[in-house]
Amino acid sequence: SYLSGAAKTVAVAGTHGKTTTSSMVATMMDRMGMDPSFLIGGVVEGYDTNGRNGNGGYFVCEADESDGSFLYLNPNVVVVTNIEADHLDHYGTLENIEKTFCKFMDLVGEDGTVVIFGDNPHYVELARSTGRHVVTYGFGEGVDFRCVPVAGRPRLQDQPRERGDYRAVHKREGS
């Protein structure tokens, strides 16, 4: 797409959680020294803006599914938080929404990755139906990356490879 240019693009979509998730991805990439550009539907905490032109060759965007315009993106990685019956004025049925999300996930191409909420087997089935590389995350057993409490603090576990835990702290209101 025009906005991402030649940058490797991470596009975040879903009925809920797009702004939070895309903000987290952009912030993590920036703190890892990747200096991403980003365009997000809300102000990113710590940046006081919803968009930035970075120099790292990466672009993180909030992908809006409400009217199907996310199909105009050219993502390398797609993150899908959830798929629910929303925007029925445009899609008509949940089945049509799911078909459109499958088209969106298919945009990553053969060398791309789809990251999807793995606690919902139907979402995983939809993602895998595209034939793309799928990575799952969630709270339950069997996901690739699992959020679990460890010593009272949340941790993100890399399940299949057993490489260890990653500390992922959620900042709560007033903390």
Which functions belong to the PLM regions below?
Residues 1-118, 122-132:
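Phosphate-binding loop of NTP-binding sites
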Residues 91-98, 112, 128-175:
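Adenine nucleotide phosphate-binding catalytic loops in nucleotide-utilizing enzymes
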